[in-house]
Amino acid sequence: MIQIRQFQWADYDAVVAVWTAAGRDALPRAELQAKLTRDPELFLVAETGGEVVAVVMGTYDGRRGWILRLAVHPARRRLGIATLLVHELENRFQSLGCPRVNLLVMPDNAAGLGFWQTLGYLPFPDVLCSKPLQEATP
């Protein structure tokens, strides 16, 4: 049985393991701590048998919700876990009065785009712009 709940610091290593298994970079504790000061209720884990198997992280700026990261351990994919996590996150956005949720999908991620479209997320022709505010260290 899948249980969805809010992230706790005791989950950090398990969440990093899910991100790593899913091919994602881990967020450093300091970066995560900053995120958790804003909207900790939008950082969710899915667990089964006491094991964290998936994670979703969102944020709400008062105008729009953003789904920042979704990852499911590869051994637990295609079981509906991601859909459960997203629906719970959407419910939490709604309870905050959030009128719209956005997310970014990499252009070469056809499977990811297909997943989001099945949940009603539609592509927009927006252009993403980015500017580093600190120089990268070699």
List each language-model region with its residue ranges.
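Loop/helix-junction capping segments adjacent to catalytic residues or to phosphate/diphosphate-binding pockets
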Residues: 26, 79, 110
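Conserved acetyl-CoA-binding loop-helix of GNAT-fold acetyltransferases
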Residues: 78-91, 118
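Acetyl-CoA-dependent GNAT
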Residues: 2-69, 73, 86-88, 92, ...
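Short, charged/polar, Gly/Pro-enriched secondary-structure boundary elements
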Residues: 136-138
